[in-house]
């Protein structure tokens, strides 16, 4: 039996919708009263694990799940040893550098050397500024990183942006985009090579499902 790691949060609904289109029904995870973290599809073909987004690639890398669905931002940050199979074309967002709208900084290169940059995506932020050859101090924050510039603790932030509304409401503005992110289908490399549980067929069905679902997945 295949095991699928599903992310809690914004990607869950469309992940379940896509899996249901290929005959795997984990919609019980969407029930408001559900407290189960593991359920079996009614067909008996697969088991679903409901985990934090950051943990999806961990379960897949260690083989406790053969496949999983997670945002590219998490994959880029964590660099897990997993097979990247399909861009699922939903869950769009972008990784951006943002500063106070009232600041003089119009691009990252305007930031003074050794500025502080707050982010929960420490590796992505460090990689970006190293690429610019601009020395900055990355300040790890795991709550509302917008407070960094607001309180004066940091000159900038690196964070995921969907609509930009949160930035605007807190007086911040984007000055550049590091990369764009969508949901991705990943697999345990050995399980995929061995075609465990007829995994290749399922992946192909999901790939075809993405194409047919494109008009409604957002």
UniProtKB/Swiss-Prot annotation:
**Can you state the subunit structure given in the record?**
Heteromultimer composed of HisG and HisZ subunits.
- What GO molecular function terms would the record report? ATP binding; ATP phosphoribosyltransferase activity
Q: Which NCBIfam families does UniProt cross-reference here?
A: hisG
What Pfam families does its record include? Answer: HisG (PF01634)
According to the UniProt entry, what is the EC number of this protein?
2.4.2.17
Q: Does the keyword Heme apply?
A: no
An example of a Gene Ontology cellular component annotation for this protein is: cytoplasm
Query: According to its UniProt record, which protein family does this protein belong to?
Result: Belongs to the ATP phosphoribosyltransferase family. Short subfamily.
Q: Where in the cell is it found?
A: Cytoplasm
Alphabetical UniProt keywords? Amino-acid biosynthesis, ATP-binding, Cytoplasm, Glycosyltransferase, Histidine biosynthesis, Nucleotide-binding, Transferase
Question: Quick one: a GO biological-process term for this protein?
Answer: L-histidine biosynthetic process
| Gene symbol of the encoding locus | hisG
Which first-to-last residue range defines the signal peptide? Answer: none
What is its pathway? Amino-acid biosynthesis; L-histidine biosynthesis; L-histidine from 5-phospho-alpha-D-ribose 1-diphosphate: step 1/9
Please provide the record's free-text comment about the domains of this protein: Lacks the C-terminal regulatory region which is replaced by HisZ.
In its UniProt entry, the species of origin is given as Trichormus variabilis (strain ATCC 29413 / PCC 7937)
Q: Does the keyword Glycosyltransferase apply?
A: yes
Q: What catalytic activity is recorded?
A: 1-(5-phospho-beta-D-ribosyl)-ATP + diphosphate = 5-phospho-alpha-D-ribose 1-diphosphate + ATP
Q: Which InterPro entries match?
A: ATP_PRibTrfase_cat, ATP_PRibTrfase_CS, ATP_PRibTrfase_HisG, ATP_PRibTrfase_HisG_short
EC class of this enzyme?
transferase
**Superkingdom assignment:** Bacteria
Q: What is this protein called?
A: ATP phosphoribosyltransferase
Q: What does this protein do?
A: Catalyzes the condensation of ATP and 5-phosphoribose 1-diphosphate to form N'-(5'-phosphoribosyl)-ATP (PR-ATP). Has a crucial role in the pathway because the rate of histidine biosynthesis seems to be controlled primarily by regulation of HisG enzymatic activity.
């Amino acid at each position: 039996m295949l095991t699928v790691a599903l992310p809690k949060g914004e990607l869950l609904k469309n992940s379940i919708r896509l899996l249901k289109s290929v005959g795997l029904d984990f919609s019980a995870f969407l029930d408001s009263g559900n407290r189960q973290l593991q359920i079996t599809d009614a067909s008996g073909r697969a088991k679903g694990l409901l985990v934090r987004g950051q943990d999806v690639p961990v379960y897949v890398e260690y083989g406790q799940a053969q496949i999983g669905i997670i945002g590219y931002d998490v994959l880029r940050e964590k660099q897990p040893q997993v097979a990247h199979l399909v861009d699922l074309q939903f869950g769009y967002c972008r990784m951006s550098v943002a500063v106070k709208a009232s600041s003089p900084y119009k691009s990252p290169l305007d930031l003074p050397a050794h500025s502080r940059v707050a982010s929960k995506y420490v590796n992505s932020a460090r990689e970006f500024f190293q690429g610019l050859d601009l020395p900055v101090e990355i300040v790890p924050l795991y709550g509302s990183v917008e407070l960094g510039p607001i309180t004066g603790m940091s000159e900038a932030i690196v964070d995921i942006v969907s609509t930009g509304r949160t930035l605007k409401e807190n007086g911040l503005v984007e000055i550049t985009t590091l990369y764009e992110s969508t949901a991705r289908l990943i697999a345990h490399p050995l399980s995929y090579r061995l075609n465990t549980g007829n995994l290749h067929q399922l992946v192909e069905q999901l790939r075809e499902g993405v194409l047919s679902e494109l008009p409604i997945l957002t």
